[in-house]
Design a protein with these regions (language model features):
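Conserved glycine-rich cofactor-binding loop
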Residues: 14-15
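Conserved glycine-rich Rossmann-like NAD(P)H-binding loop of the short-chain dehydrogenase/reductase
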Residues: 30-46
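Substrate-binding pocket helix/loop in short-chain dehydrogenase/reductase
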Residues: 94-95, 99-107, 196, 200
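Active-site helix of classical SDR
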Residues: 118, 152
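Short C-terminal tail/terminal secondary-structure segment
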Residues: 141, 220, 231-245
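Short, small/polar-rich loop/turn modules that mediate ligand/substrate recognition or access, typified
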Residues: 168, 173, 230-232
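A conserved structural motif in NAD(P)-dependent oxidoreductases
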Residues: 204-215
């Protein structure tokens, strides 16, 4: 797969899964890699340095992906060969302990932002380009204290399906990747982090937990011409974990 030296955008692209995606797309030929991030300037600079070493030009955009200003700044660095919405946030609480502001914050960044990115970036994207959203198993399975994030990921997958149909006449593919349990800093927000990792390690049929590079490989596939007829789908990358009752 080659991105023909085009620019790509990865939100939440400076750490964990996002950084792995950015580096993978750079290895596939992306000339400029725009990285969105909310905080941790040191991690952003480290990711930028790794991209330079890989031969790509990094562009760092700091801010909340749910912000119209940030989305407009992302669009200004296009046109893109691929837009990957990996950024995610949320409040990890039981349903009855959540507040309306938690809902607005989580849904805005995780789901609405993909629609905002499509409105801002898709008009300038060429046929053969891709939009990819990164989801999680919580979109279809009930995870402890995950009501807000799980609902937002279900919404993201729905947005993916609608965009896939509406953008098909432009030749733009839209899909999602749903990652299993991945040991990144994002898991630090879960009070049952160690239990989740232990369960994933012992119950995953593939014999190991998912790594960021596994997710990046799936995203790269969806951004490639090989995925020409894959539209509006959510590709599950979990080593078979979700197949078990």
């Amino acid at each position: 797969m080659s991105l023909d030296s085009r620019a790509v955008l990865v939100t939440g692209g400076t750490r964990g899964i996002g950084k792995a995606i950015a580096l993978r797309l750079a290895s596939e030929g992306a000339k400029r890699v725009v990285l969105g991030f909310l905080r941790n300037d040191a991690a952003a600079e480290e990711a930028a340095e790794e991209l330079r070493a890989a031969g790509a030009e990094p562009v760092l955009v700091r801010g909340n992906v749910a912000s119209g200003r940030v989305v407009a700044e992302f669009a200004s660095h296009g046109p893109y060969g691929a837009v990957v919405h990996n950024a995610a946030t949320g409040v990890i609480r039981a349903a009855l302990e959540t507040e309306d502001k938690h809902w607005d914050w989580t849904l805005g960044a995780n789901a609405r932002a993909l629609l905002s990115l499509a409105r801002a970036c898709a008009p300038d994207m060429k046929a053969g380009s891709s939009l990819v959203g990164v989801s999680s198993l919580g979109s279809t399975r009930v995870l402890e204290n995950y009501v807000l994030v799980g609902t937002s990921k279900a919404a993201l997958e729905s947005v993916v399906r609608y965009l896939a149909v509406e953008l098909a006449p432009r030749g733009i593919r839209v899909n999602a990747v749903s990652a299993g349990v991945v040991e990144t800093e994002a898991l630090d927000h879960f009070p049952n982090r160690e239990q989740m990792l232990k369960a994933a390690r012992t119950r995953t049929p593939a014999g190991r937990i998912v790594e960021p590079d596994d997710v990046a490989a799936a995203v790269a596939y969806l951004c490639s011409p090989d995925a020409e007829m894959v539209r509006g789908q959510t590709l599950i990358v979990d080593g078979g974990y979700s197949l078990l009752a």
